[in-house]
Amino acid sequence: MAKLKLPFALCFSSFLLFFTLVLSSSVFSPIDHYLINCGSHGSTVDLDHRRFVGDSNSPLLSSSGGESLAVSNPLPGSSPIYHTGRVFTRPSKYVFSIRDPGAHLVRLHFQVLNTGLDYSNAQFYVLANGYLLLDSSSIEKTWNSGVIKEYIIRVDSDKLVITFVPVKKSKFAFVNAIEVISAPKDLVADLAQYVSSEKNEQISGLLKNGFETVHRVSVGGPKVTPFNDSLWRTWLPDDEFLKSHDDSLSKVYYSGHIQYQNGGASREVGPDNMYNTARIIKSSSDSIPNVNMSWAFPVDEGYKYLVRMHFCDIASVARGMLYFNVYVNGYMAYENLDLTMITGILASPFYADFVVDEGLSGVLTVSVGPSNMSETRAVDAILNGVEIMKINNSVGSFDGEFCAHSVLKTWRTGNGGVVLFLLAAVFLLLTATMLIKRRSSEIGDSIVWSRLPMEIPDAISKRYNQLSSSKV
C-alpha cells in the first residue's frame, strides 16, 4: 500500500512563498441564521445567550403545524429551549428561505417534555431537501436526557425544507428547537485523502455529499461549550475514547495566542479553546518511545466517514523538531508529518481530512505516533482535536436504507403492506445491482467523488490557496 510522505523543500517551497503570515481577524456572520424555539409563542434566550424565536403563527411552519407543548415546572438549570416543543401527527414541514446558497449547518434538538404525553408513540422520520436525516428509533433511548443532531447540508436552491413524518397515522413526531445556519466557505473542503487497506489516494467531490456529526472531541482539554465556539458547537473531552496509557503520554496547555493564518484553519474550523490543548508523546531519555496514542469511536456500520484531525504544535520549543505518523483505522495516513513545514510557524493550526469506511465491527480508530524521523528528548506526536462525520449513503440517507421519497410515499398510501412489499423488492433489486457493479469495478470508482492523480502536498497547497483566494 502506498504511504503518504511529505518531502521537504520541493513540494512546499511555492506554498510557503504564498502563505500569508497575517492573522485572520474577520468575525464570521452567517447570512442565513435561523434559531427556532418550537412550540413557543415568543422569543427565548438559551444558556449560551442566543435568542431563539418562537414558531407559533410563524410563516416558516406549514399549515399542518401540529400542536405546541410546554412544561409548567421545568428542571432547574435546563435550557429554556427545552421547556417547549411541537408535536406532529401528520407530515409537517418548516420552510426556510435561503439567501446564501451552499453548505448549511442544521441542528435538531430533542428532549422529552414532562407533559403526560406517551413518548412510546413518538416514531418518525426527519427529511431535508431529499436527505433522510433521522429515523427516531436511533435516538429514542437517549432523548430523555436531550439529543442534538447536527448536519451539514448543501442547499443550492432558495429553500430548505425540513419535514417531520410520523411512521404511521397512530404515531407522532416532535421537536424542541431547530437551527439553520449558513456555513463558512472553508468549513468543508472538496478534497480529502481516501485511506483503506488497499489505497491511500486523493479524492475530490466531497462537497457533493451531506454530513452528520457523530463525534467531536477536544483532545486533552475540557468540554468546549457553544458559547466559546464561533459556530456554536460543542467539543467533548476525549477521555472516554482514549485507549492508550503510557508514561510517555501527557497533556499540554498553551497559554499564548493561537496563530490563525489566512489560508489555514480558521476559528470557524476550530476554536482557540480546542487548539490550545493537546495530548503528546514525548521522549525524556535517549530513546524514542515505541508507542502510539490511539482513540476508538463507535460508529454505524455501512457508511463512509469523514475524519478530520486537528493539529497545532503548541509543545515544541522550535520549528522542525516534531515529526510523527498519523494512522486511521490502523492504516498509514501521513508519514513523517512536520506541522511547521506546512504552517511556517509554531502554534498555528492545521487540519487534515480523511475518508474511511467504518472500520471493524462499527469502531473507527485514529492514532498518532513517532516516525523514523522523530528526535529524542523532543515531542514525538501531537493531536488537538478530532471530528468524525457520517457521509450519506447512496440513497441520501444518514439513518438506514429508506430514502426520503419512500418515506413520503409510504405515508401517502396509508402505510399499506403492498407498498412496504414493493419498497422491500426495490431495495433488494438495488442491493443486487450494487453488488454486481461492485464486483466489476474498483472500490474507489463506487464512491460519488473522483480520484485525483496528485501528491498530497500539492493538494494541501491547492486547498490553502483556494481558501486564501476566497477570503480576499
Regions found by a protein language model. Name each.
Residues 2-472:
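Compositionally biased, intrinsically disordered or flexible polar/acidic segments
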